[in-house]
């Protein structure tokens, strides 16, 4: 729906400033560390780590802070007073029924809603995780990627009800699938690149 799309866009835009700030802080930290310790610089690796820091910052703000926190914050910055609305701590919900079941069996969801919420809202959001984990942590293997992916997803879902969001079985499934797709994509790309050398 148009309202749902506007909400997703607004939520994304609200976390952009804090993500940029985190990126700037990380760059300053790396420059100081490299100069102080006279380290050699692998620019590709540094860029990947920078993107990973920005991605994690954005991800954490999208899924592990109250959904209206940043809109409240920017409202206060702009107007000098609070909206007075609650942030909704400990008001989260729980869903243990996959939405695909609701769509296929009960007909409660439209295919458009399912694609937007599940594929775009969940799976695509975690594909970068699967891509960047093996690039940032070079010695990580397939088994550890699977373990890390499921642990990150479970941790997020367990914490979400605390910040007024929902524990959702769909999120666990789609986030995990997104991470694995990202990992497989980067693995295939690396192997093809090595083959063509």
Q: Which role does the model predict for each range below?
A:
Residues 167, 172-173:
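Loop-to-transmembrane alpha-helix initiation sites
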Residues 2-164, 184-197:
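Bulky hydrophobic segments
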């Amino acid at each position: 729906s148009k309202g749902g799309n506007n909400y997703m866009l607004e939520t994304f835009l609200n976390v952009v400033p804090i993500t940029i700030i985190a990126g700037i802080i990380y760059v300053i930290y790396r420059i100081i560390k490299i100069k102080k310790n006279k380290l050699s610089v692998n620019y590709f690796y540094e860029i990947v780590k920078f993107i990973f820091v920005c991605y994690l910052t954005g991800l954490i703000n999208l899924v592990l802070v109250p959904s209206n926190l940043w809109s409240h914050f920017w409202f206060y910055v702009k107007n000098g007073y609070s909206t007075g609305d609650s942030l909704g701590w400990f008001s989260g919900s729980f869903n243990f029924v996959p939405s695909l079941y609701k769509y296929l069996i009960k007909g409660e969801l439209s295919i458009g809603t399912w694609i937007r919420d599940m594929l775009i809202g969940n799976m695509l959001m975690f594909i970068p995780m699967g891509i960047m984990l093996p690039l940032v942590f070079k010695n990580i293997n397939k088994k550890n990627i699977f373990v890390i992916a499921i642990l990150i997803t479970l941790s997020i879902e367990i914490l979400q009800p605390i910040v007024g969001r929902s524990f959702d079985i769909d999120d666990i499934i789609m986030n995990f699938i997104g991470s694995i797709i990202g990992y497989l994509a980067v693995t295939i790309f690396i192997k093809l690149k090595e083959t063509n050398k």
